[in-house]
Amino acid sequence: MQGNLPPEAQEKLEQLQDLQEKAQNVATQKQQAEQQLSEAETALDALGDIEESTTMYREVGELLVETEYDNAHDDLDEKVSDLEVRVETLQKQEDRVQEQFESLQEELQDMLGGAGGAMGGGPGA
């Protein structure tokens, strides 16, 4: 099908495919960040149930290193804040890519006479 398209339409179709790949990458990154955020929030909540005098350890590479309660709390709190910003940033990026995709898809459909063309949707396809 791509061989029958005008060069401008083929270029738009390639851009659409690139945007689709980018959207999938952003969605994957967002999902990973959301999972990390959930885990960090759970750890922070669990830390709230532990006495401050309890011996604490944190993972450093392959090692467990003793740490102070306040340090562990501060580190987790900072991690949660950073991940919240990351998730928000990725959501905005995901929205922006989706808008670009929809706009480009509309341009391509207009270019192909609104019949759905390469998207396979219209009666003239």
Swiss-Prot record:
<dbReference type="InterPro" id="IPR009053">
    <property type="entry name" value="Prefoldin"/>
</dbReference>
<dbReference type="GO" id="GO:0051082">
    <property type="term" value="F:unfolded protein binding"/>
</dbReference>
<dbReference type="GO" id="GO:0005737">
    <property type="term" value="C:cytoplasm"/>
</dbReference>
<keyword id="KW-0143">Chaperone</keyword>
<protein>
    <recommendedName>
        <fullName>Prefoldin subunit beta</fullName>
    </recommendedName>
</protein>
<comment type="function">
    <text>Molecular chaperone capable of stabilizing a range of proteins. Seems to fulfill an ATP-independent, HSP70-like function in archaeal de novo protein folding.</text>
</comment>
<keyword id="KW-0963">Cytoplasm</keyword>
<dbReference type="InterPro" id="IPR002777">
    <property type="entry name" value="PFD_beta-like"/>
</dbReference>
<dbReference type="GO" id="GO:0044183">
    <property type="term" value="F:protein folding chaperone"/>
</dbReference>
<comment type="similarity">
    <text>Belongs to the prefoldin subunit beta family.</text>
</comment>
<dbReference type="GO" id="GO:0006457">
    <property type="term" value="P:protein folding"/>
</dbReference>
<dbReference type="GO" id="GO:0016272">
    <property type="term" value="C:prefoldin complex"/>
</dbReference>
<dbReference type="Pfam" id="PF01920">
    <property type="entry name" value="Prefoldin_2"/>
</dbReference>
<dbReference type="InterPro" id="IPR012713">
    <property type="entry name" value="PfdB"/>
</dbReference>
<comment type="subunit">
    <text>Heterohexamer of two alpha and four beta subunits.</text>
</comment>
